[in-house]
Amino acid sequence: MIQERADIEKAYASNLRKFAARLEMFLRTGVEYGTATNILSGLAKEAEDNAELHSNIAAGLINPVQLGIKNWQRENFHKSSISTSIKEVKNFDSEFENAQKTWYKHYKNVNRCKKEYFHACKTVRSLQVQVQNAKNEPFGTPEQLRKIEDKLRKGIMEEEKTRKAYEEALSSLSDVTPRYIEDMTQVFNKAQAFERERIIYFKEQALQMQEVLDISAKPNLSQIFVGLRETVAKVDADADLKKWSLAYGVDMAPNFPVFQEYSPEMSALGKKGRSALADGSSGGVTLTSLKTITSPDRGGPIPGTTDSGSNISTSPVHTTAYGSNSYDHGSEGATPSDYTSSVNGAAAAISKEKQRVEDTPPYPDFVDDGRPGVPIRALYDYVGVEADELSFNSGDLFEKLEDEDEQGWCKGRKDGRVGLYPRQLR
């Protein structure tokens, strides 16, 4: 019984924890925002605290209540080694049997004498009827009447004999009855004392069980719901709406399109420049500067030679920037052969890097590595413009893998595909 109630408390606590986990998961989806998230977090905490409370109740029912009862049973009820009966019960049965053994022997004798006396009386009554019928029978003979009368006389004698034996048996039973009453009373009182001890202990354990189950007496119960009320009271609708308006509404800072001059040198350095070559850990070269250089053969300024994969700028005579090292060849008296050698060397390096980049996937950063993400929900429709962008409809669920970069783009995963999406989408 106690174990069953403890299992009920455990199951209730388990369901509360599952409910709290679902609230936490829903909270992480980002559907609710601002101070309104206090409602979900408050309900989740209330469920967790109540689950802990009922887990403690289940533990309290097992120990000390159930454990105490089992220990008391082991100390007061001992099982027999040769049977499943309880030794104490068997001992009481034996004591009751011994207390009434002598009296019971006389009692059986009384029942036997009574049965014999009643049988003799029945026989006499039957013979008396037969004698009366024989006297009234016109065709009867004197010999038949005499035989029946002889049987009647013997029956009357047997009746007297059994009556006397019956009375003597009752007298003997009366003589042993006081001792029988005394012995039976002694054994009965002993059994009553044992049963009284059991009932008193059972009552004590029931009261202890009541203390464990009485959640109204738990000091932390009221604090659970006071904390829930205080948490929910912190919800401020006006503050949430104002914050939303500042982030996504009419109060947000305007960012209308303005005219931008096309710059092919910088097009590879935007949000899509995430190749292994551009990664600092890949050992590739990095753009250090953009310069206007003068060709000795042309006598006018030409744009510096750059490559989106290697990000190298070259200069005919002044400085060639490769990685973080600069080499000064002098600015005076440079010959065309010096210029040609410098450019050819840089061009060879650029060609080598181009070949290595062509052998790598177009967007190696967007290969799904199976890492877990944070579930979020799209607030607006968005159609990807380039191949590494994700497309969504309002309300779609997807996963965020990385926070936004300096360009305002986040990395996410939808339907098993990894790509970029604008921060304002979520």
From Swiss-Prot:
Nucleotidyltransferase as UniProt keyword: no
Residue ranges annotated for the F-BAR domain, each copy included: 1-240
Keyword list, A-Z: Coiled coil, SH3 domain
Record's compositionally biased regions (Polar residues): 305-315
UniProt GO MF annotations: phospholipid binding
Coiled coil: none
Stretch list, region Disordered: 287-315, 350-369
Any one Pfam family match given in the protein's UniProt record, by short name: SH3_1
GO CC, one annotated term: plasma membrane
Top-level division of the source organism's lineage: Eukaryota
Domain SH3: residue ranges: 371-426
GO biological process: cytoskeleton organization; plasma membrane tubulation; regulation of endocytosis
Full protein name: Antigen EM13
Organism: Echinococcus multilocularis
